[in-house]
């Protein structure tokens, strides 16, 4: 089967968070990793300023199913697809969901790949 990669950016709806942010992240990552293990999906989740950026990779159906779940998450809005394409290899082959908190904004603002993702209104 062909590998597929999707990347999206979305704005966080802080009023929909039920737990303090660190607890919300831990709970969400546990759920994501459990689901990804069953689905064969890998990827990364970056928390940047008021947004998250997520990369998902795996077989097309499983990746698109995951994107559909994200689109229905009440904690997110303004979801914007960045990459949707076949992939020759996985960028995160050993990570059910890599996570990095870049909320200070400085690291992301200086990163040549991340900055354009944040410059959208």
Question: For each of these PLM feature ranges, what is it?
Answer:
Residues 1-121:
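Charge-rich, low-complexity N-terminal segments
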């Amino acid at each position: 089967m062909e590998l597929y990669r999707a990347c999206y950016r979305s704005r966080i709806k802080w009023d929909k968070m039920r737990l303090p942010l660190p607890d919300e992240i831990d709970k969400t990552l546990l759920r994501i990793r459990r689901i990804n293990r069953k689905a064969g999906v890998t990827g990364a989740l970056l928390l940047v300023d008021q947004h998250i950026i997520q990369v998902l990779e795996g077989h097309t159906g499983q990746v698109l199913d995951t994107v559909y779940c994200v689109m229905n998450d009440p904690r997110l809005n303004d979801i914007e697809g960045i990459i949707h394409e076949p992939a020759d290899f996985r960028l995160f082959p050993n990570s059910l969901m890599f996570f990095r908190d870049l909320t200070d904004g400085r690291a992301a603002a200086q990163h040549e790949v991340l900055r354009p993702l944040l410059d959208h209104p």
